[in-house]
């Protein structure tokens, strides 16, 4: 493979790369668009993929109403759109070698379907508008038809697996303006860094505030404002710090509860490591060791060094104390199904999870003569069957289209539901809240899975 590195530093990666661009910080997006323009100009882009999986019709209709909405007009329209992003301009603005830029563009164009890319914090987080770097890099992935291909670039969610929890209440209907303020409607994460400022502005009052493995006084901007608010009982009534370490914020908490690290608690994990999916099971090793030696452990903190809490057990116990008679509708979410009237145990919880939400695991465990929970306890992880190549090209069976209506653009719509990540028939797992629940898009007369966007395609132009 040819390695291309864009980094103002002579990093370890840059030192091993075939081509290194030491672009002026903040100009990386310009450089990438210059490469994109060369691909289109020279005809070395994957026009077939672009026509099939990009919403180019919307792009032409909305931005170029003077042109007929036919694919033959897409290339010329893109060249006009990116007219200023010439190799000469990129060399001047980015401080790079023009000939090397042309060479790199040719190299990328010669490897359609095999463009693997990655961006991290430097250019994206270090500059205002740095998020455009990731978007422009993804444009190269699309122009080369390298989305989800062997040797290409996967969406990270395709290689993670999140099982559906066995018990899950309906989402609450109240919007939290303290965490999701209306001033930032497009924020990807909650605006927790602004919480003390909202409290000082009189927007609200926190009766009870949990900080879970979170040290805002040290981590967030303007730590002294956090210190001020954490000490002010008129702003926060009770502060509970759930933390594995003593820290600056815990100093100002009413209660400090030691929380376990990965080897002291139960949890599931999944990361994008290869062209497949897997799920891992974290468990308290001291408790597991004692149980293997014949001991009975009722609560994990009895086995953990320093009586460290197992936080899922903590919240189950806390919920039962908050709602002892079940009148608030809280206790029922943490009540045993096998033994009604008693709290849910983690053995029961994870048994339900592994038996019903991880495809292939029950069969694998049965072949060994053990339960799915015992399988995960012994082996620690499970690799799900199948690969994740070109997820969007998967056929969608008719059963998944039930209740959906095909619109004028070929999208099978099922409004009002969270988007599933894959075939509903195949799995009881999903990447939550992606898409709008539309199960498929029609491509050449066939229902395909597509992408979790309103058009079910890669959106060059979003309405």
Regions found by a protein language model. Name each.
Residues 81, 102-117, 195-207:
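Glycine-rich phosphate/diphosphate-binding loops that line cofactor/substrate pockets in enzymes
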Residues 2, 9-112:
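Long, well-ordered, tryptophan-enriched scaffold segments
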Residues 284-390, 398, 404, 410:
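Long, C-terminal catalytic modules of enzymes
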Residues 1, 20-27, 65-69, 73, ...:
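Alpha-helix capping and helix-loop boundary segments enriched in small/acidic/polar residues
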Residues 92-96, 120-128, 160-162, 214-217:
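Conserved short loop/turn motifs at secondary-structure junctions
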Residues 45-49, 101-102, 115-117, 145-156, ...:
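Acidic/polar loop patches that form or flank catalytic/metal-binding clefts of enzymes
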Residues 16-17, 71-74, 85-89, 118-124, ...:
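Flexible glycine/proline-enriched surface loops and loop-helix/loop-strand junctions
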Residues 1-4, 30-33, 138-255, 260-268, ...:
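Extended redox/cofactor-interaction regions of prokaryotic respiratory oxidoreductases
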């Amino acid at each position: 493979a040819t390695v291309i590195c864009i980094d103002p530093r002579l990093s370890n990666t840059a030192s091993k790369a075939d081509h290194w661009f030491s672009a002026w910080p903040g100009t990386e997006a310009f450089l990438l668009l210059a490469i994109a323009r060369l691909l289109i100009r020279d005809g070395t882009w994957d026009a077939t993929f672009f026509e099939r999986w990009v919403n180019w019709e919307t792009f032409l209709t909305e931005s170029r109403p003077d042109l007929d909405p036919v694919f033959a007009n897409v290339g010329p329209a893109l060249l006009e759109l990116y007219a200023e992003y010439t190799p000469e301009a990129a060399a001047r603005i980015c401080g790079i070698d023009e000939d090397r830029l042309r060479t790199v563009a040719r190299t990328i164009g010669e490897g359609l379907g095999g463009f693997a890319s990655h961006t991290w914090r430097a250019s994206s987080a270090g500059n205002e508008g740095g998020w455009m770097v990731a978007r422009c890099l993804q444009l190269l992935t699309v122009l080369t038809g390298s989305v989800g291909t062997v040797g290409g670039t996967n969406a990270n969610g395709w290689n993670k697996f999140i099982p559906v929890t066995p018990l899950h209440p309906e989402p609450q209907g109240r919007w939290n303006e303290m965490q999701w303020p209306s001033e930032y409607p497009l924020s990807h994460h909650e605006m927790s860094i602004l919480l003390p400022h909202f409290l000082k502005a009189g927007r609200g009052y926190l009766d009870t505030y949990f900080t879970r493995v979170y040290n805002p006084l040290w981590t967030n901007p303007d730590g002294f404002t956090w210190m001020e608010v954490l000490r002010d009982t008129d702003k926060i009534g009770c502060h509970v710090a759930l933390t594995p370490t003593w820290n600056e914020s815990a100093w100002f908490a009413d209660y400090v509860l030691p929380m376990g690290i990965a080897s002291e608690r139960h949890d599931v994990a999944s990361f994008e490591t290869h062209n497949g999916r897997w799920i891992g099971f974290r468990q308290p090793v001291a408790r597991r060791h004692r149980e293997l030696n014949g001991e009975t452990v009722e609560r994990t903190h009895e086995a953990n060094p320093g009586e460290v809490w197992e936080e899922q057990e903590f919240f189950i116990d806390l919920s039962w104390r908050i709602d002892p008679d079940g009148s608030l509708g809280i206790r029922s979410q943490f009540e045993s199904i096998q033994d009604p009237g008693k709290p849910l145990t983690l053995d029961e919880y994870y048994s339900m999870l592994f038996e019903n939400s991880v495809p292939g695991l029950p069969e694998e465990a049965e072949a060994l003569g053990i339960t799915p929970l015992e399988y995960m306890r012994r082996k620690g992880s499970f690799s799900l069957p199948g690969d994740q190549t070109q997820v969007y090209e998967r056929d969608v069976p008719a059963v998944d289209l039930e209740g959906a209506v095909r619109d004028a653009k070929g999208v099978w719509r099922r409004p009002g539901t969270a988007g599933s990540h894959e075939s509903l028939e195949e799995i009881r797992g999903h990447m939550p809240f992606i898409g709008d629940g539309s199960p498929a898009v029609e491509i050449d007369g066939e229902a395909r899975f597509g992408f979790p966007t309103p058009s079910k395609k890669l959106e060059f132009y979003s309405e």
